[in-house]
């Protein structure tokens, strides 16, 4: 699955590339074999394609600096790790470490390791390597002084070198660690902007020292603060927070999700400061990394629902029907009901597609309901006047020749005038009688037009019977 935070990182990277007329490169980082998840690469391709985040170079489209799968670049990483040993920025380590000791530190974790191999003369170390002795290659971090790095969001950050650990760059199986592979590949692939989560801030000083040891130009770092479930907790699939796939499955529109995710921790400036709705193309024109916030962003599902509802309203009737039809087909099985008419009715009030079955469940079958629904303070209806209204409505609708929303409304407004009551005293009881619900996707006459004359009259008679008990 694609975590919302990962989608945001991909989106920001794509926007930076498009804004500056650069190249967006898709690289598969699979050097930490223990963390590989089957099918994860397919999810990346599928999600990026769905979201319109097209890449200029990558494993599937090729490019001038491939291969774009890191595990296929093993020899290249070995070459640069050994080159770094020659330059004094790294050393061979022959300590008998367990796999756990050699494993990569989690983002933000410092794994202290003081190694005697650091002082081995290079020629002696090379002889031991040639003799077949197992080894890893570690970064040689200075014991004294400080390292300062610049981040586009967080500014300059200075770290004491004594707090940094001589991290493993090349593991005993010949594969690089994540940190080393990314520095080498970012340089070789000409990466100018590195966008990642703020949990990698603690690794940035070590990256800087690697760039300096090689004599390479340091790219622009853009560290994004985490996406939070609330003020205290990060979003986590383990705790039931939705992934991109979950949101789409629930019936959110990709365009709405992207729009919302873009604004999770980034704010437009100037004339767009108050604006909330953007297409991907519009974002690409105005996206500026100076708008990325240092503060964590809270994922507000209610705000996303609201935004999605606005996107639903903007869809053409045809486009909405295309999205809603699979859901409506399973929710409304009566062949006499026009699904396009149902879609037209629900579209203005639809927040997410997965809400639709509950919104239209009364169409196939009138649910059992309490007569208390007829009592409505605002509509000024009681059990008594609701019964009177339905009894007056029945003969009027029985005699109606043309069964359309307009004709129904006209006839019922005329009835209310004749009875000398507010329109709502007639319309609210009718709405309850034909739907059995307090909340419906349309008004009373719209529901009657949808259900047809025979079904509507049968439900009105049921309402009269219930209120007469």
Which positions does each model-derived feature cover?
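Residue-level signal for inorganic ion chemistry
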Residues: 13, 44, 84, 88, ...
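Alpha-helix N-cap/helix-initiation motif
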Residues: 2-6, 33, 196-199, 246, ...
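Basic, alpha-helical terminal appendages of large translation-related enzymes
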Residues: 23-27, 38, 54-60, 67-68, ...
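N-terminal Rossmann-like or analogous alpha/beta NTP/dinucleotide-binding catalytic cores
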Residues: 1-107, 203-216, 256
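A generic structural motif
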Residues: 30-32, 188, 195, 311
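Acidic, glycine-rich active-site loops and adjacent beta-strand->loop/helix elements
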Residues: 28-34, 198-199, 228, 304
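Catalytic adenosine-cofactor/nucleotide-binding cores of aminoacyl-tRNA synthetases and other
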Residues: 214-371, 380, 435-469
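Active-site cores that bind ATP or allylic diphosphates and position pyrophosphate for catalysis
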Residues: 91-223, 228-235, 243, 401
